Amino acid sequence: SKYNLVPLGMSLKMCLLNKDVVEKNFDKEFDKFKVKKSSKKFLLNKEQEESLAYIRNIGNNYNVTVLEGVTGSGKTLVYFKRIKDFIDRGFQALILLPEIALTNQFNERFKEFFGSESAVWHSGTSKKNKSIIWKGIKDGKIPIVIGARSSLFLPFKNLGIIIVDEEHDASYKQDEGISYNARDMAITRASIENIPINL
């Protein structure tokens, strides 16, 4: 609430769900989100290898790194490799996308790499799926979320890294209701959690 000068209650409302969700057992639903070993090999080119090595060398504490490259240049694969570093060590990851329309295409690439469904969070996600994702994130049973701005407010149990894809996109700005820039708030959250954020 200090970040965007709104009452604390309004900020908390963005993070909380009905108490019935907290008490429900969704264990069977979480299986589809478990990362599996993909049968497909994903090889990086020289530039991608150099970018990944650079990001890894910066470390796992709070830092802001911008990965430059036009759309389709291979940034996503670098993101995925970096996310896997954290998932293999028991951490969770958040991938922010500027547009809901991008999630389907991104999700297909995600399935190829991680061998599992992704937990997708945006305004079009059903109430039931939101309940499952919220509980899974809170309990540490869902490792990765792909989402729009509002996914920033999910109660991650052990968040290890945040990725902001297309960080320059104007869609990250919200002017209605609580006004904020999701990219800037993602950087703030990474700072608070002392974790890296890649833009």
PLM region descriptions:
Residues 1-199:
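Accessory, non-ATPase domains that flank or precede helicase/AAA+ motor cores in DNA-metabolism machines
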